[in-house]
């Protein structure tokens, strides 16, 4: 079953900037283990707080990434750079949306409906 893993990290004192660099280096490795996408976010209101996201088609692929040599090495090398325990969760997406820029407008801009091809006005 597809899902997204969210890993909440909290860096220890004065290590947040270095932790960010290290986490940004290891996060893309998830793609080699079958992830469709990954992301790392850093909180603006608490610069020690990070969220790591990785979307997988199968939970087993996540486990292979988390227990793989790259992530084990990351956790060992940087064990004093973040607080434990690290309690990640497997999440199922229930809704999503996005605005896509660069697409031509559906209407001609004259208000007469030409070019409208879908929706209630069609």
Question: Where is each model-derived feature located?
Answer:
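Enriched - but not universal
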Residues: 12, 65, 69, 84, ...
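Short, well-ordered beta-strand segments in beta-rich or mixed alpha/beta enzyme
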Residues: 3-10, 39-69
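Glycine-rich beta-strand-turn "strand-cap" elements at beta-sheet edges
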Residues: 2, 36-48, 74-122
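Long, low-complexity, intrinsically disordered polar/charged segments
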Residues: 1-17, 56-62, 78-84, 88
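Short acidic, gly/pro-rich beta-turn/loop elements at beta-sheet edges
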Residues: 17-19, 50, 62-64, 98-99
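Short amphipathic alpha-helical segments
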Residues: 15-38, 70-74
């Amino acid at each position: 079953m597809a899902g997204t893993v969210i890993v909440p990290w909290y860096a220890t004192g004065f290590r947040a900037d270095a932790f960010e660099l290290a986490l940004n280096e290891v996060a893309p490795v998830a793609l080699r283990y079958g992830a469709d996408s990954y992301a790392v976010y850093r909180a603006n209101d608490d610069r020690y707080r990070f969220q790591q996201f990785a979307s997988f088609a199968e939970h087993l692929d996540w486990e292979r990434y988390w227990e793989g040599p790259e992530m084990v090495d990351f956790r060992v090398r940087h064990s004093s750079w973040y607080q434990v325990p690290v309690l990640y969760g497997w999440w199922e997406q229930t809704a999503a949306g996005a605005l896509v820029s660069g697409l031509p407008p559906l209407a001609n801009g004259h208000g007469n409906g030409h070019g409208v091809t879908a929706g209630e006005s069609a």
